[in-house]
Amino acid sequence: MKYSVPVAFLLLALLSFGQNPPADAEQKELTAALSEAGNSPLEFARVLEQHLTKYPNSPQRDELISALVKASIEVADKRRILAWGEKSLAQNMDQPQVLERVARILLEVDDKDRSERALKYARKYEESLRALAGSAPDNPTQKAKFLEEHDRAVGRSLSLQARAVGNLGKTEEAIALARKSFEIYPGHEPAREAAKWLAKSGKGIEAARFFADAFVAPDSPAEMRAKDRAMMAESYRKEKGSEAGLGDLVLEAHDRAVGIGVKRLARLREVDPNTGVTNPTEYTISSLEGGKLKLASLKGKVIVMDFWATWCGPCRVQHPLYEEVKKKFADSEDVVFLGINTDEDSTLVKPFLESNQWGTKTVYFEDGLSNLLRVSSIPTTIVFDKQGQVFSRMNGFIPERFVDQLTARIAEAKGQ
């Protein structure tokens, strides 16, 4: 979330019209300070911190602290996240992002009190996430992304708990939590956490295996790989006396990572068949009637995609011109026209088409395709040649030239 002048004004509006507005002098001072903060979230946080220090009993204290914490998260200001994040959580624990950031910062220091606080926040973080499990959106693309991020977040919450209980001397519980985290979302963090506590408990080979998992994890930062490699070798040598066979351990970890990735992708594609697809002509899109069209089935044909929406005025102007071009190629079996609707609310589409007497036969929903093709404005018309490459892209249109231009582009693509 970006903090800018408009956001500052929203905060000021809250202060002005809230149930407990601050005194005029306080509000004037805050208004002036926020105006000077400009577009910088760092300055925004500094202003709010100074204001709260001067006015610790401000009627809008909770709202100001919440805004301060969000701005601090934006710029990764650990001091302010910790100092004000715990104050914010004391008023409202239902803040997953704040719970995670505060717990993570607390665990940067191996201290009993900090670990106990971090454990409390990490457990609440997990609880908040699991409460959200049933709120996945209906849209397949959004649902797949939600499930992926939800699993990743739950895994993070368990890794944080593992670190906290480990710091508190509960090694076996830490190992169990780290293993559970890795099962939910295999990645470098839970693998490294499990390896650390396994090594501490004297289970060198198991530790080496998890260090290998961290080493080969696709999401592992480059700067951590060398450390994982060293720890893996150290744990292995303690058990085996040398590094002979260590390469096999790494290969096994690689094969596990590949297998895990394949299974996860298959699971997500049950929800959204386009998960992980990077070639637009390999996409599967939904028809207005609920059917599915695999664009790969159109291989060898020229594909014309018209991206539009019910709320788009220029799209209505372009539509009869687009239909005129379609008629020119009505007898061309190697040209396919697809209307790609981009409305967020798909229930608006059919009534719109019926009331405007537009055809429904070749209308499909974008299902994430517009994002892949970076369609940022509509109408946009994209022509793919018979090899599946983008041959022409028309962002917007010039009414008096559109028919001739699109006709020429399609004819040229047919001849390729």
Show the residue positions of the predicted features.
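TPR/TPR-like (Sel1-like) alpha-helical repeat modules
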Residues: K120-R130, G204-A222, V250-D255
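Thiol-/selenol-based redox modules, centered on thioredoxin-like
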Residues: K386-Q416
